[in-house]
From Swiss-Prot:
The lineage of its organism: Eukaryota, Viridiplantae, Streptophyta, Embryophyta, Tracheophyta. Residues 1-233 are annotated as: Alpha N-terminal domain (alpha-NTD). The keyword ATP-binding does not apply. InterPro entries: DNA-dir_RNA_pol_insert, DNA-dir_RNA_pol_RpoA/D/Rpb3, DNA-dir_RpoA, RBP11-like, RNAP_asu_C, RNApol_insert_sf. The N-terminal domain is essential for RNAP assembly and basal transcription, whereas the C-terminal domain is involved in interaction with transcriptional regulators and with upstream promoter elements. Its main location: plastid. The gene is rpoA. It is found in: Plastid, Chloroplast. One of its GO terms (molecular function) is DNA-directed RNA polymerase activity. One of its GO terms (cellular component) is DNA-directed RNA polymerase complex. It comes from Angiopteris evecta. This is DNA-directed RNA polymerase subunit alpha. It catalyses: RNA(n) + a ribonucleoside 5'-triphosphate = RNA(n+1) + diphosphate. Belongs to the RNA polymerase alpha chain family.
Length: 341
């Protein structure tokens, strides 16, 4: 049986990252394609993955701060521009990554004048500040600011009870949510005999983990959620099938890019990826835009000979396009309409 004749139910579902970019230290973006699904399956998976991304991914946050000679959170310290409340709000915004589930202690001991940022926090080895430039406070005089803080790893929100705190102690309402936003969409293709769906997932993170790490963790959490429903014998069968690469419809999170995924991505995904992702020089980019080449799908309609016929589009520009397509999408344009490289 040739590949195109394999039923959808017998094809291994696989995924690939079709777009990835770092918009800033605290904003990472990733777009993923997962397929093939039978009718209705993609929406089911999309809903579950999105909810898992938004509610089940663990994050790290500052949950407690302590400073001597401070009565309450609305106090001000002579020589510091911000009030204690402002400093606590700034602590809440600090993006951290931690490899430990234990409560970690960190310290700030800075003598002014100085602008205090996340870089000035003395963190334990297991904790990393994602953006060292995040502002905490500004010391305007020759005074020393000493603060002890606690860092924890959890998920969701945590509203602290400040009634139990003593003078100089401040419990911080923490947000353990590294996912800024998550969207999904489902696209259908094929005919009545072979109807398939492809799922696209978009993930924005705060930089404490990559979108790919977030997708893996969300998927793992969903799998763990269903494990109690499986018997030991069934788990052994699934394990054996995985070892023999004969699983039917199980989502395999691997980085391999199959021919099937490439073909479907060209038909659907590349229509939504703009040529900006190729990061071409201005000359080549502007020439393509002038002939209405806006997406990768538009570009794939051209052969190498077609590109050379574009006004002011020389050999160097063609080579730049070919190199970018190969590097980012593993695509080779044919030399002409009648050949395939």
């Amino acid at each position: 049986m040739i590949q195109d004749e394999v039923p959808v139910s017998a094809q291994t579902i696989q995924w690939r990252c079709i777009e990835s970019k770092i918009e800033s230290k605290r904003l990472h973006y990733g777009r993923f394609a997962i397929s093939p699904f039978r009718k209705g399956q993609a929406n089911t998976v999309g809903i579950a993955i999105r909810r898992s991304l938004l509610g089940e991914i663990e994050g790290t946050a500052i949950t407690y701060a302590k400073s001597k000679n401070v009565i309450h959170e609305y106090s001000t310290i002579i020589g510091i521009e911000e009030s204690i409340n402002d400093i606590l709000i700034n602590f809440k915004e600090i993006v951290l990554r931690s490899d430990s589930y234990e409560t970690q202690k960190a310290y700030i001991s800075i003598t002014g004048p100085k602008d205090i940022t996340a870089e000035d926090i003395l963190l334990p080895p297991s904790v990393q500040a994602i953006d060292d430039s995040q502002h905490i406070a500004t010391i305007t005089k020759d005074i020393t600011l000493d603060i002890e803080i606690e860092i924890q790893k959890d998920r969701g929100y945590r509203i602290q009870d400040s009634k139990e705190s003593q003078a100089g102690e401040f419990f911080i309402d923490a947000v353990f949510m590294p996912i800024r936003k998550a969207n999904y969409s489902v696209h259908s293709f094929g005919n009545n005999k072979k109807f398939q769906e492809i799922l696209f997932i978009e993930i924005w993170t705060d930089g404490s983990l990559t979108p790919k790490e977030a997708l893996y963790e969300a998927s793992r959490n969903l799998i763990d959620l269903f494990l109690p429903f499986l018997h030991t014998e069934e788990e052994e069968i699934i394990s054996d099938r995985d070892e023999k690469s004969e699983s039917n419809g199980n989502i395999l999170l691997s980085n391999s890019i199959s021919t099937d995924i490439d073909r479907m991505a060209k038909e659907v995904a590349f229509k939504h990826i703009f040529i900006d992702q190729l990061e071409l020089p201005a000359r080549a980019y502007n020439c393509l835009k002038k002939v209405d080449v806006h997406t990768i799908s538009d570009l794939l309609k051209y052969s190498q000979d077609d590109l050379r016929k574009i006004k002011n589009f020389g050999k160097k520009s063609v080579d730049q396009v070919l190199e970018a397509l190969q590097e980012r999408f593993a695509i080779n344009l044919p030399r002409n309409k009648f050949s395939i490289d």
